[in-house]
Structure formats: structure tokens, C-alpha cells
Amino acid sequence: MCLVNEFVSNSNMKPALNVSGDEKELILQLRRYLEEKLTYLLDQNGTVSIGVSGGSMPRVFSKAILSLPQEQLNWKRIRIFMVDERNVDLDSEESNQGEYLRLFPNELRDVFVPMQIFKDPCLTAQHYEISLRKYLLPEQLNNTARFDILFLGVGPDGHTASIFPGKERLEKITELNWVSVITDSPKPPPSRITLTLQTLQHAKNVAFIICGKQKAEIVRGICDRDQKYPAAQARPFNDKLTLFLDEDAATGVPDRDSSDSDSPPPFDG
């Protein structure tokens, strides 16, 4: 299996950069991005599909989207999906979707498309893919879904979603499916469900939220398209990539002074 998807762009387009000094500024930048994208997408599409990750993202994403003028959002046309999840019960402290549900008001929890958890992670993945195919219009090419926006994080090893570095791990991920099972995650718990790299690459917009000096090297790898990092491979093939960074992570941006730092993301939905 080829580790680099055939749809990775060969263009030299740089990611759009948004660098923040603290979490408050980060949330404001995320809010601006969400407001622009959702305004456009809700005007153009029947529904809007958003994929979200775990870690610290539930807190900052929830604060950003819930701070938008609620009267301007048609929540019935917004669907939020998990990019990846640990195969644990919803009430577990390790559950990412459980954390999102705890942060969202009861009346808005229906925007989340649930990932039903089974003891067997393969069953969890199968049922989740069925749900995705029900809610998302598949891309004609390769029958692959196109999320409107994916919000991704990265680990200090360069993993994103639950796609960890290493040839053997990457080769276990079935690119023909939208969802894959991870049973040997280097981070506990070992069993996880994740969107595949091909699914990430087909998204219309991908936004990374990255903070910390220890991730500056990964930021450089993403900007330089260093394929040893899954996070770099997750760049969408249309190159609509936005990085939300703190000052420490931004030290990894090559030639930052001559880049499009703090510029608004490429915008046509």
C-alpha cells in the first residue's frame, strides 16, 4: 500500500496561519473562522458536516462555536462527527464524544451524530461508517466522503486523529473505507476508531489546532509536507489547510516572516 495518497497536492500553496498569544485569542480566531465558513456553507449546502477531535479541542471548539450569534445558526442543518474516538463507554472520562456532550447544552446535543460503542471495536467502526454514509453525500471519486470542515489536533510524535506514525501502523489502515480500527495505539487505551487518511484528505477544509513548543517540529513537518508524520499526510488534496497555533508552536513555521502569517484562510467554502 502506498503511504502517500495519490490526491496529495503538488502545489506550493502555504497553509493559512493564525497565531494566538493565549487561549482567549485562539477561541476568538476559531470563532471568526467558524462564522465565515458556516455562513457560506449554510447558504450553499443543505447541511454542514463538521468533524472534531479530542484532547483539549472539546473545550476550545465548544467555546468558539457556542459564542457565535445563535440566532444566525440553523442548528438543524449542522452535523458534528467524531474524527476519532477511544472505544470506551460514553460516560467514561476517556470518551471524547462524552466530553463534547457534557460541554454542549442539552438542546443542542442532537447536532452530534453518535458513535455507538460496542465491546468489539470492529463493530463500532462498522456501525459508525454506516452512520457516516447515511448522513454524508459521498464524493463520486473513490466513493469517499467529503466533510465540510475537519478540526484536527496533533501529538508530539506527529500523529493526528488516531493515525500514528510508523509504516506498519499506517499500512493497517484500510484506505478503501471511511473508518478504520486501531487496536495497538501507543497511547492508552489501545482500541480506537478513526477516520482514514483518505477521508481526511478529501475534506473541503482542514484546520489544525496546535499548541506547545514540543509540537513546533511537527508544525514544520506539516508546512514542509514531511510524509513521515501522519499530520502532514492529512493535508486536504485541495490544499485548503489552516493552522491555528500558539506562539510556541508557531516557531516551527518555516520563513514565518515571509509567509501568510495571521492571514485569513483561503475562502470559498
From Swiss-Prot:
GO terms for biological process: carbohydrate metabolic process; pentose-phosphate shunt, oxidative branch. Residues 248-269 are annotated as: Disordered. Transmembrane segments: none annotated. It holds the Pfam family Glucosamine_iso. Gene3D superfamilies: 3.40.50.1360. Pathway: Carbohydrate degradation; pentose phosphate pathway; D-ribulose 5-phosphate from D-glucose 6-phosphate (oxidative stage): step 2/3. CDD domains: 6PGL. GO terms for molecular function: 6-phosphogluconolactonase activity. Its main location: nucleus. Its EC number is 3.1.1.31. It is found in: Nucleus. Keywords: Hydrolase, Nucleus. GO terms for cellular component: cytosol; endoplasmic reticulum; nucleus; sarcomere; striated muscle dense body. It catalyses: 6-phospho-D-glucono-1,5-lactone + H2O = 6-phospho-D-gluconate + H(+). The keyword Chaperone does not apply. NCBIfam families: pgl. Hydrolysis of 6-phosphogluconolactone to 6-phosphogluconate. Belongs to the glucosamine/galactosamine-6-phosphate isomerase family. 6-phosphogluconolactonase subfamily. This is Putative 6-phosphogluconolactonase. It comes from Caenorhabditis elegans.
